[in-house]
Structures are given as C-alpha cells and as structure tokens.
C-alpha cells in the first residue's frame, strides 16, 4: 500500500502534501523553453491497394519513404480475450471483436528484420523499426481517419543527456514516500508481521506453526509438476476489472487506459533483474458500469480485497485449460481506501503467495493514472510471494537494498535499470522451483507483445490529463512549473483558483514517458531528452546462459550431502525486452556419501537438538528437549523441520527447510533438496537405484536374514508379553485389528525396553493419537489406539531389544488377535519360544483419572482478523473412552484467532 509522504524537513517551496485536497504549494517558477533540433515531421499516410486482409500505406519523412504492410494481429490479448460490461445498457456480457481488429503488425519496405505495430484504438497510432531506427506515429486530429495529418518521430537509444537549455532534473530525497501495504503485513509496511514471515519461509529463526497451517494450495488445475531448478516461460493469465468509479471517470477511454497500464506493468516484468521469464496476459476485461453489479468497494481496504476475491470467483472457469481461465484477478478503482490505523492513502492491497489459489489470487489497485502500473506490478509481486525489500528475511539475506526497487514498502520512484531487488528475484524463483507456480505453465496460443509507443504521445495522457487522473477532474497542469520539476515532478493547479499556486504530492511523480517538455524534447525516465539524441532504436537482445560455476560446499560431512552448481543468464543478459534464458539454471549432485559413525542419533534429530536451549521451557521453567516429528505431517511438508517436545504433544516448525541431504522420513530413502523430496538410494546417492532389502542390506538380495512371524491372543488382564524383538531386527510390523464396529476394544499395544522402561502405553496411560517413538536414532511409528488397525512399524534396524506387549483392560466376546513379523540375520541365535509367551500377568492398579486429549490445530483460513484455528479437546480415560471426569477449569483452549489485524500489502 502507498501513502503520501509527510512534510517533515522540507524547505517551504518543496513541501509535499499528505492528502487531497492539499493545502497550497508552490511548485516553482516558470520554466524556459528547451532547445534542440526537431526529430519529427508531420506526414499524411497514403493508403496503398492490397488484399482485404492487409493494411498497406506509404509515408514520406526524413528524406526517405516508408511502405508499411500490416496484417491483423491481436496477440496483445489472449486468444479468447473478451471485454464484458456489467450493469449498463449493454449489461449482458459479450465480446468486442472490433477491438481485436484494431491491432496490426507487419514489416516496413519489405525488410525481414523490420517490425511494425499499429493500433486503430483512438485513432491510428503505433511504431516501427527499420535499419536500426525506431519511429512512432501519432494522429494530430481527433478523428479515426488514416489520411489525416500524423506526427512521425524518430527514436534511438543513445545516451540520455540532459537538455542543455534546462537545469538538470533533480530528485530530492524523501523523508518517506508512498507506502505499499500487503495482506498479512503490518500497518506501517516497513517490516512484515511474524505471520507473514512464516508464510514466506523465513531462512532462520523460529517458525511457530500448526500441523496443517501454512500449506500452499496445489496448483489449480495442474496436471504435471514442472522440473525443479529449470527456468521455464510463465504466463500470468489475468482478469482486469474496472469498477463504476473508473467507468465514470474515464468514459470511452477506460479500456484503452487499463490496457496501457497493464502493458507498462508487463514491461516491468520483462526486466532481467527478475531472473525469470514472466509474461502478463490479459484474458478478459470486465467493466462495471453500475455499482450494484460489481464488488462492494469501500474505504476499508482489507474488506474491499475480501469482497473482490469472493466476487471474482464467479467469472473464473474451473479448468486451467479453458481459454477464459485466469490465474489472478485485478480490480481498478478510483475509490480511496484505508489500510490500518485510519490511514486512508493506500494504493494497493493483495494477499501474499496466492498465485495458484483461485480464491485468493487477487489484488485491488487505486487508480491514479499511469502510476497505477507501478502499483499493479507491486501488488502482483506480493501475489507471486515477494516480500517487501526491507522485511527481515530480505535484510538478513541481502542487507539493506535501498528504496528504489519495485517491492520497496514506500513508493518514491523505481530504479528502471534495476527495478527488481535480488530478494524479489529469489523469492519468486523459490515459489516457482517449489512447484507453487505451476498454474502459470500453460501458455496461450499467442503471447502478449509490449506496445512500443510511449504513453505521453497519446492525447489520453497529455499533461492536463495526467494531472486530472492523479489530482482530480478539476485540476490541470501548472503553467509555472520550475525548471527543476520538468519531467521529475507533476504539479497541478485547481482550475477555479485565482492564486498562482500549484500542488504536488507523492514526492516524485514523473511525467509520463513521451510527454513534450520543450521544443524538440520529450520526457523519458524523469529526464528531458533531446529527440535527436535518441536516433537509433535499442536492439532487442535475448539472454543466453553463462558457464556453470564450480561446485559449492557439501551440505553434510557424511551420510550423503548435496552440493550445487548454478549458471546465470548473463552471456549476454537480456536487454530491451529480450527473452530471458530458458532451461536448467541449477544442478546438484551427491557428496560425502560414506556412512556416518554411529552415535545413536539421526541427522534430523541433531537438527532438532539445536533448539534444546533456545529459550523454550515448560511451565516450570525446565528446558524442553526436542525430537523429530513425523506423524501427522503432510507429505508436502516432510522437508520442514518439525520438532516435538519429548514426552509432550507440543511441536513447532523450527525451519522451513531441513538441511539438504536429510531423509524425508523414517520410512523412505528419499532425501530433501531445497525443501523438496527427491529420490535417492540406500548408498546416499541421488537417483541411485540401490535399495535396502528386507534384511536391511543396501543392494542386497534378501538372503542374509530370515522372517520371524507369529500371532498372539491375550488370555489375562493387564500387560501380556507378546514377543521380544532383538537388536538388529528389521522391517518390524505389529498389528492389532479391532472387530468390525468395535473401535475401542479395551486392548492396546505397548512397548518397553530391556530395563523395564515403557516407551508406549505404559503405566495404564494410553496414547490415542499417532506418534513417533524414538529409539537411539531409529523411529518406530505408532498409529494411535483410536485407529481401527492399531499398528507399530519400523523399517530401520532396531538398535536395542524391545518387548511388545498387549494391555487388556476389558473382556470381549471376541478377543483381539495380534500379528507380528520382522526379520533377523541368519546367524542370529533367536527363538520365538524363548522370547514370547512369558505371559507375566500384571495386577491392574486403580486407573488414574481421565485427562484432556488434544487434537492438532486446524489450518488458518487466513491470518487476518475474523478467522479462527480450532482443535479437538476431549476428555478421555486411560482406555481411550470418552469421560466426563476431567477438571473443566484445566481444559485447554480449543480455538484461537489467526490474527487481529487486516492484512495490507
């Protein structure tokens, strides 16, 4: 969200305004005319005969002739692009084929390397490239006829030198600029909230999450996953919506305006500093002509965003393959709306990282003329998961990055040579590499070309019109603009004011590129440039990959680590809208694959232990001991560092990604690489086909062990020994199935060590939910007593002998039966008779009192005010049966708010 700057510390003539209507402000003294040769001529195109599907005409200027041969080309729009009007005299939705027929492209003088693009929207205008020179053509009258006078201008890149007849344009430093706000951000926009940092997968520090929270939805309608670490062309198919306030303000120029704004934003996303190939495509435009037909828009920015997100869903097609399906929706409005703290100078609102979520991939833009293009690019950046440049994760990774990138929290002006910060590029790349942007892979049959004409050439963006769009319909350009403010600061004066006082705001509202700034001069990027200084067009340069860099450091010293090599799209770097490199940008390989010395701890366990003295204590002040948590973790979250407090149900996510080379789980050989599971062999090599056989031998044939199996039916109350599984046993599987219709049969699996210490369901305390049992680095997975099939499993070699028991606390007509299997080495002296049916009958003591059993927190619908997380809190006795004897005063909470604030961008 953007906010107007304060006036602190400014000299009287340069004070900036907080709000409109602003107090009087003198922009400066009258500016003198610029100097320089004229690089344009008035021409009248001559229509040439041709086919019905071809437009051909001749121009004479600059001592040469130009013959343009053009064919209809609507690739600026998606193939099924439509404009629909809601609520007006044409309330019924319908396409506008006439608009599609107004775009043409072709060649000049028959040259294969030439390029021409023309539009008949609001008169014939466009541009063409020939022999290294760029030309733009604009009508000089109000009609649509081709044979009226047009101004032909010659352009080129060159050095942008200041007008020698004018003082150099100066951009003054601002105490603060306009502020962006982001959903899940704080009211000041200067740093993101804890919740927002959690969502963005903070690189260090504690992440407090619930089991199911923070899950990014799967790509909507996506059938296949993109390859990781591969640069692929992405297409952001977009719905543009203009509300009734936009229709009233722009009238018949509305569709031209929002397409111009969109094309400017698309150009920003083409810059190589974003380090990805991102193409913006317009699928549909909805123009709301009657307020009641559109989304509810108010001065509450957060509520407006929620309303629009809900409203836009009705127009989206479910299938990503449908030509009218869009990936994100954008609302343009002239309505002022507020963020937090009664600050009503917000320019944009959006949710973070929601691009493939059809319910939340949306943003709201406050229209202020062409400045809306930067707001749109910023808000869409948040939807693509980019945080603010001054957020804690960005600062930790890259240090302070200045205030002039696209994702700066305050909008002053954008560094057009480097619009995207390194942090923005990294977060976007991670989103795409993690598969959360796969909905952007489907390409329309035609892509969106960027218009080459500068907006300042159009009558829609004359200086007076620019002032009206930003300050209001009663304002016009200030005639006494100072030399210092030309092209740099847009100043306006109320048309009914008798005082020669001009107003400005926002710190540095540049004049639109192409705006005349003196005889023979035009504005370009805030500078008044001689037309003849830009004689040759900037050649489009496609990017190409540089060499692979040396392999980096291995992530582990033993047990199978990962090392990376990468290459950059810098040989050459894309320039002037050239294509970003496609293909593999990062490769990795296994390293240090030798086995680690046995220490009784898994690599994931060592990572959890790091937080044992991390200021985490229980209610008595004792430090908690953290062990890995596997049970209840979603498969897509297996590479997050979930840790559980030993002996407790509390767990936390300490890291968004475990160290590369960590096993994804106790029951798989796959390993984590940058937060994603990849296949690996038992030799710790990525993509290796080697597997553990049933004996636990890597690459073995299963001949080094024998199977031990049996069954057991309890015959007495209490704890009954079933079998003692020896150290070294592998592929352990113990099952106790309840009878049909009987969930709690009064019999429960138990597990104890050789010294009599219970690891599971001991002392008549029953674990009702799934859990992990850690035994010297080996994990045994327990299903929980509430499961219909109560099960105890381990795929790793058992480090010490364990005794499996069955606790029986009630009689059954059909007593349950326990079955078990495991494998032991052939040379192990093991006898089932010696290990089972020792049947020590334990006297059942009086059952302890019932206790509260806690479920896992549900997923947060959002982190904004009004949404709640919930969990089950049930009173159960040791047998797992529901009870009413728990102390209500000690009942834990079963609901908590997800957030207490609206979430601005």
Swiss-Prot record:
Write out the ranges of the annotated region (Disordered): 139-163, 186-225, 877-905
InterPro entries assigned: ADAM_Cys-rich, ADAMTS/ADAMTS-like, ADAMTS_ADAMTS-like, ADAMTS_CR_2, ADAMTS_CR_3, ADAMTS_spacer1, MetalloPept_cat_dom_sf, Pept_M12B_ADAM-TS8
Provide the propeptide boundaries.
29-228
**The keyword Ion transport appears for this protein:** no
Residues annotated as binding Zn(2+): 378, 382, 388
Task: Name a biological process GO annotation.
Answer: extracellular matrix organization
From the UniProt annotation, give the residues forming the signal peptide: 1-28
- GO CC terms for this protein? extracellular region
GO terms for molecular function, please?
heparin binding; metalloendopeptidase activity; zinc ion binding
Q: Where in the cell is it found?
A: Secreted, Extracellular space, Extracellular matrix
**In which tissues or organs does this protein occur?**
Expressed specifically in adult lung and heart and low expression during mouse development.
Q: Where is this protein primarily located? A: secreted
Q: What is its EC number?
A: 3.4.24.-
**Role noted for this protein:** Has anti-angiogenic properties.
Q: What is this protein called?
A: A disintegrin and metalloproteinase with thrombospondin motifs 8
Organism (species): Mus musculus (Mouse)
């Amino acid at each position: 969200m953007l906010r107007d700057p304060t006036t602190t510390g400014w000299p009287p003539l340069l004070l900036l305004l907080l709000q409109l209507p602003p107090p009087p402000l003198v922009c400066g003294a009258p500016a003198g005319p610029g100097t320089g040769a004229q690089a344009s001529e008035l021409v009248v195109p001559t229509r040439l005969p041709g086919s019905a599907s071809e437009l051909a005409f001749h121009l004479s200027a600059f001592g040469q002739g130009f013959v343009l041969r053009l064919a209809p080309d609507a690739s600026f729009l998606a193939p099924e692009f439509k404009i629909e009007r809601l609520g007006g005299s044409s309330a019924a939705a319908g396409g506008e084929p006439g608009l599609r027929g107004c775009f043409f492209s072709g060649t000049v003088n028959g040259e294969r390397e030439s390029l021409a693009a023309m539009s008949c929207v609001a008169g014939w205008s466009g541009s063409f490239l020939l022999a290294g020179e760029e030309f733009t053509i604009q009508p000089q009258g109000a009609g649509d006829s081709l044979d009226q006078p047009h101004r032909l201008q010659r352009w080129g890149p060159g050095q942008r030198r200041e007008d020698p007849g004018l003082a150099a344009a100066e951009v003054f430093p601002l105490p603060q600029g306009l502020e962006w706000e982001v959903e899940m951000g704080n009211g000041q926009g200067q740093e993101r909230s804890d919740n927002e940092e959690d969502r963005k997968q903070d690189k260090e520090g504690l992440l407090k999450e619930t089991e199911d929270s923070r899950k990014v939805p799967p790509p909507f309608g996506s059938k296949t996953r993109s390859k990781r670490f591969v640069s692929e062309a992405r297409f952001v198919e977009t719905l543009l919506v203009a509300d009734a306030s936009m229709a009233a303000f722009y009238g018949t120029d509305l569709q031209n305006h929002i397409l111009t704004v969109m094309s400017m934003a698309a150009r920003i996303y083409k810059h190589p500093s974003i380090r990805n190939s991102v193409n913006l495509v317009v699928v549909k435009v909805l123009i709301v002509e009657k307020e009641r037909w559109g989304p509810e828009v108010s001065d509450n920015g957060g509520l407006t965003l929620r309303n629009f997100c809900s409203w836009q869903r009705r127009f989206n097609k479910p299938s990503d393959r449908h030509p009218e399906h869009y990936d994100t929706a954008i609302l343009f409005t002239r309505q002022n709306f507020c963020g937090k703290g009664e600050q009503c100078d917000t320019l944009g609102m959006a949710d973070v990282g929601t691009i493939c979520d059809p319910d939340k991939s949306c943003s709201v833009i406050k229209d202020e003329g062409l400045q809306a293009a930067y707001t749109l690019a910023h808000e869409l950046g948040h939807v693509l998961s980019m945080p603010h440049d001054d957020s804690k994760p960005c600062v930790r990774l890259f240090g302070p990055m200045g205030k002039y990138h696209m994702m700066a929290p305050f909008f002053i002006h954008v560094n057009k040579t480097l619009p995207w910060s390194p942090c923005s590029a990294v977060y976007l790349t991670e989103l795409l590499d993690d598969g959360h942007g796969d909905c952007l892979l489907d390409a329309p049959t035609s892509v969106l070309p960027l218009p080459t004409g500068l907006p300042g050439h159009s009558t829609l963006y004359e200086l007076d019109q620019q002032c009206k769009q930003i300050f209001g319909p009663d304002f016009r350009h200030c005639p006494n603009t100072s030399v210092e403010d030309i092209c740099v600061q847009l100043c306006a004066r109320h048309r009914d004011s008798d005082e020669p006082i001009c107003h400005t705001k926002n710190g540095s509202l540049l004049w639109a590129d192409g705006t005349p700034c003196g005889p023979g001069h035009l504005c370009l990027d805030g500078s008044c440039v001689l037309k003849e200084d830009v004689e040759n067009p900037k050649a489009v340069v496609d990017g190409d990959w540089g060499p692979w860099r040396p392999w980096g450091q291995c992530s582990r010293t033993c047990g199978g680590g990962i090392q990376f090599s990468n290459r950059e799209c810098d040989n050459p770097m894309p320039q002037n809208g050239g294509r970003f490199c496609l293909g593999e940008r990062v490769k990795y390989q296994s390293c240090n694959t030798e086995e680690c010395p046995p220490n009784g701890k898994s690599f994931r366990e060592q990572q959890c232990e790091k937080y044992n003295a991390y200021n985490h204590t229980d209610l008595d002040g004792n430090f908690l001991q953290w062990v890995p948590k596997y049970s209840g973790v979603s498969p897509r979250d297996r590479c997050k560092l979930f840790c559980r407090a030993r002996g407790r149900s509390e767990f936390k996510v300490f890291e968004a990604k475990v160290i590369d080379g960590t096993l994804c789980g106790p029951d798989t050989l796959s390993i984590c690489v940058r937060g994603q599971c990849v296949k690996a062999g038992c030799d710790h090599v990525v993509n290796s086909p080697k597997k553990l056989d049933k004996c636990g031998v890597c690459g073995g044939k299963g001949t080094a062990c024998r199977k031990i199996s049996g069954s057991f039916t309890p015959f007495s109350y209490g704890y009954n020994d079933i079998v003692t599984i020896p150290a070294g046993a592998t592929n352990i599987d113990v099952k106790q199935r309840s009878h049909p219709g009987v969930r709690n049969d009064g019999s429960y699996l138990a597990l104890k060590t050789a010294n009599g210490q219970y690891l599971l369901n001991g002392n008549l305390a029953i674990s009702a939910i799934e859990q992990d049992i850690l035994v010297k680095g080996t994990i045994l997975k327990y299903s929980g007593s509430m499961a219909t099939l109560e099960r105890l499993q381990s795929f790793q070699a058992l480090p010490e002998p364990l005794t499996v028991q069955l606790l029986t606390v009630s009689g059954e007509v059909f007593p349950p039966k326990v079955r078990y299997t495991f494998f032991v080495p052939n040379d192990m002296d093991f006898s089932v008779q010696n290990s089972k049916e020792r049947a020590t009958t334990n006297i059942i003591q009086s059952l302890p009192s019932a206790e509260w059993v806690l479920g896992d927190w549900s997923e947060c619908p959002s982190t904004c005010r009004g949404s709640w997380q919930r969990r089950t809190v049930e009173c159960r006795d040791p047998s797992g049966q529901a009870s009413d004897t728990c102390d209500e005063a000690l009942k834990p909470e079963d609901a908590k708010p997800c957030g207490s604030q609206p979430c601005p961008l």
